[in-house]
A protein has these predicted regions:
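Conserved catalytic motifs of ABC-family nucleotide-binding domains
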Residues: 175
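Catalytic Walker B motif of ABC-type/P-loop ATPase nucleotide-binding domains
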Residues: 179-182
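ABC transporter nucleotide-binding domain
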Residues: 197-286
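Conserved ABC ATPase signature
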Residues: 154-158
Length: 335
């Protein structure tokens, strides 16, 4: 199965004249629920986000952080308590129908009517959005997502991965300039995950702004050019992915040695060195304070013969855990 864009792009790469630079803007967004006990539960607290037009934007956070609440507000499934939200320059309060037409949402839940075929489901969805029959791209979209041969099969007969793709197809029937993917690869195998990644990249390259929530940090690191992290209803980080990855000023060097060692040599004692096995030596250092040349000079002074050397850097998972732990202890801050 191959996922590839068809002849017609889902959205032109350049926005119409006069359109704002940001595809989604939320300012001072708050959502408070009333618990059964009568106490107030704040799901979102003063959220400020600006998602650049044409970006592939990641929204991360632990369970209960507020990600789904934010998405449901943008999809107009949840009413915000206060603040403003605009999609493609359209205010949700002033022009709710126009704002709804500018966004496609792929929910995490596979809520598909089992008694309709994929073709029928897309035709119904297009009708709900007022897409004229002559402008509908039902078979093109199904083909793009590898579902053309299942267009007349009942949805209940589709596999979980096919249903996930069908949810993406439903969100694209009205050619929205903004696409929200809520955990799009949850429960799918590795091959399908890679195929969906490829299709998301193609949509984004064609001009669609993509907002992605995911629990797979590898997915966000692989796809997203900018990431916001939400914890306890607040934005605790919002930066380009590359900048976030530079936040942890830590690297590890692993040396594979030619001869066995009984302990860490004295010239390396000033580094955070650890003998992982008789011929495997690991050193931790901060690139901002220590140059790699200093370490190599110390290795030479210790008389070590190196067979191989690898460098390990912090990944998004390390940063995510550090930020959420810091925020939970009250030392974090909203970005």
């Amino acid at each position: 199965m191959s996922l590839a864009l068809g002849q017609k792009d889902p959205m032109p790469a350049a926005a119409p004249a006069g359109m704002p630079d940001d595809a989604v803007v939320v300012r001072g967004l708050n959502k408070t629920y009333r618990a059964k006990s009568g106490s107030a539960v704040q799901a979102l607290i003063d959220i400020d986000l600006a998602i650049p037009r044409g970006s592939l934007y990641g929204l991360l956070g632990p369970n209960g952080a507020g990600k789904s609440t934010l998405i449901n507000i943008l999809a107009q499934l949840v009413i915000k308590t206060s603040g403003t939200a605009a999609i493609w320059g359209i205010d949700l309060d002033r022009q709710p129908r126009a704002a709804a037409a500018a966004i496609g949402v792929v929910p995490q839940e596979l809520n598909i009517d089992p008694f309709f075929t994929p073709r029928e489901l897309l035709e119904l969805q297009a009708g709900l959005y007022g897409v004229p029959k002559a402008e509908r791209r039902t078979m093109e979209i199904l083909g793009n997502l590898g579902l053309a041969d299942k267009s007349e099969a009942y949805a209940r007969t589709l596999s979980g991965g096919m249903r996930r793709r069908l949810m993406v197809a439903k969100a694209l029937v009205h050619t929205p300039p903004v696409l929200v993917l809520d955990e799009p690869t949850a429960g799918v195998d590795v091959e399908l995950r890679q195929q969906l990644w490829s299709y998301v990249r193609q949509l984004n390259a064609a001009g669609t702004t993509v907002l992605l929530t995911t629990h797979y940090l590898e997915e966000a690191e692989e796809l997203c050019d900018r990431i916001a992290i939400i914890n306890h209803g607040r934005v605790i980080a919002c930066e380009p992915t590359a900048v976030l990855l530079r936040r942890l000023d830590n690297k590890e060097l692993v040396f594979i040695l030619e001869e066995d060692l009984a302990g860490v040599p004295a010239p390396l004692a000033r580094f955070e060195a650890q003998l992982q096995s008789p011929r495997r030596l690991m050193l931790r250092y901060q690139p901002s304070r220590t140059r790699i040349g200093e370490i190599l000079a110390a290795v030479q002074a210790a008389g070590l013969n190196i067979v191989d050397m690898t460098t390990l850097e912090a990944d998004l998972e390390d940063i995510f855990l550090q930020l959420t732990r810091r925020d939970s202890t009250g030392t974090g801050h909203a970005a």
